[in-house]
Amino acid sequence: MKTPPFNLFQPKTIEEAIEISSNFVKNDEQFDWIAGGTDLLPNYKWHLNTKPNVISLASIDELYRLDSKHIGAMVRLHDLANSEFSHPIIKKAAEGIASVLIRQSGTVGGNIALDTRCFWYNQAEEWRRSIDWCHKCDCDTSADCRVIPNQNELCVATYQADLAPTLLVLNAKIHLCGPEGSRNMPLSEFFELDGIKRN
């Protein structure tokens, strides 16, 4: 299957990436971030939750940093599993993620920011349309959760990433950057009990 057309932006710095994303937000334009693309691109091929604009992090050198205190968003899972700087439990978790080929492309940032999913939502749009929409699709209908119907207020799409539980056990912090500056926060505060929102 082919991906739908989208505009690809390749900033060279974090500041440039923030500026591009800020412009999209100001103009009410939808966009996605892409790191390794091992989850996003297959979803795009299936026409799942596609956006007209995609911002790639691949050209931002500082996101590849890996040492005993820092793991950049663009660090490949393969490199994390084989680094002398990685904590043994992180190495073990990283080497168990997916297949060798996916670990060669998949990134720490992409794994942590993985979208939530459920059996209903992760189907082709035609399949979903044949039944009805859901909370996560939010198509301005009074949709209901298809996994637990008739409760009409909670989305139970679950978080599927492999690396976050290990980082949570180690009390990891995440560094976030945006138009209003940067901040550090415990990784445990990054995740919300809401299947609709993407972390």
Q: Can you annotate each of these PLM segments?
A:
Residues M1-N199:
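C-terminal structural segment of proteins
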